Amino acid sequence: MIEELIRSEIRSFIPYNANQQPYKIKLDANESPFTLPPQMRKKLAEYILEDPQLNLYPDTDSVQLRQALGEYWSVDKENIIVGTGSDQLIQIIANVFLEKGDKVLYPTPSFGMYKDSCVIAGGRAVDYILDQNDNFSYSADKIIKTYELEQPKVIYICNPNNPTGNLMPQDEILRVLKACTKSVVVVDEAYAEFSDTTVIPFIKEYENLLILRTFSKAFGLAGIRCGYSIASEKLTRAVNLTRPPYNISSLSQFTAALILSYKEEIQNNIQYLVEERERVLSKLKEIDGLKVYSSAANFILIKVQNSKDIYRKLCEKGIFVRAFSSSPLLSDCMRITIGTQEQNSILLDELYAICYNK
């Protein structure tokens, strides 16, 4: 009886299932390998000891955090909304803009929430396929052509793209913005710190541009579930219409605002991971039978014919990476998060041994 009550569009959904098995090295979720700076941990402890009054609801508008983000990005706090991870903001965008049957244009392969949020809101998800023969490159021409044909309410660009790691050049994104004026163009920059690129400076020029950012990747705060959007004031006010009240806990607001003051430490971590990414890329390319995709993020996508077998053997060693066996375009692919030099070296050694039967 319960199944009959579920909306027909939702019945086929499969709840997200992260690998919960014991592990030795975890390189499957694009998390940072770095914990918080010691001085920051001390300040967090002081915050708790001083009684943050957790018996009270948090600031429903996250004013201090938005102010800190505004100063960090040189924008006004009125350009910013904070969400429980960018996942919540993606769902809010769908709830605000989609009437039943309205369309969302999203890249494939990419982050699954773009499609799921659309379906949950009663919309129609229309994908544009990234060019598999050109390292999954974006095409502004393809996006614009599909926009003209489908007239979507929302267009998603993931930049760098997850899970392929490639970048859409800024001038190509601007072409899309200039042509697709009747859509909200969402540029998801969850991994942009690793590519040193952003379209945030263009929010004043393009009223329909919305950028998504997160504290989960470069800032190493996946555990507090905090993301944010930056857009024109008019677009920000629209998105804020269905944001749940008190959606960010007091602890999360304080922690996210605090880490913004540790720019040097965070930048050092980013630089470390970028250097490791390039080292791992180079080493992976030395292994016969692997197709290795260049990356502007904190992960690398590889393709190999016996990926399921390799994935299983890595898991047996306690090394977790992400497999995509259910994705037609990525059925032979695995995504490897960049960890510490020690973690990456262990992975490379095990991968080498598996591929060469040693």
UniProtKB/Swiss-Prot annotation:
Biochemical pathway: Amino-acid biosynthesis; L-histidine biosynthesis; L-histidine from 5-phospho-alpha-D-ribose 1-diphosphate: step 7/9
Keywords for the protein's UniProt record, in alphabetical order: Amino-acid biosynthesis, Aminotransferase, Histidine biosynthesis, Pyridoxal phosphate, Transferase
Pfam families membership: Aminotran_1_2
Catalytic reaction annotation: L-histidinol phosphate + 2-oxoglutarate = 3-(imidazol-4-yl)-2-oxopropyl phosphate + L-glutamate
InterPro entries, A to Z: Aminotrans_II_pyridoxalP_BS, Aminotransferase_I/II_large, HisP_aminotrans, PyrdxlP-dep_Trfase, PyrdxlP-dep_Trfase_major, PyrdxlP-dep_Trfase_small
The protein's enzyme class: transferase
Domain of life, source organism: Bacteria
Modified residues (N6-(pyridoxal phosphate)lysine): K217
Enzyme Commission code(s) on record: 2.6.1.9
Example of a GO biological process term: L-histidine biosynthetic process
MF (Gene Ontology): histidinol-phosphate transaminase activity; pyridoxal phosphate binding
Cofactor: pyridoxal 5'-phosphate
Family the UniProt entry places it in: Belongs to the class-II pyridoxal-phosphate-dependent aminotransferase family. Histidinol-phosphate aminotransferase subfamily.
Subunit structure: Homodimer.
NCBIfam families: hisC (TIGR01141)
Name of the protein this chain belongs to: Histidinol-phosphate aminotransferase
Source organism: Ruminiclostridium cellulolyticum (strain ATCC 35319 / DSM 5812 / JCM 6584 / H10) (Clostridium cellulolyticum)
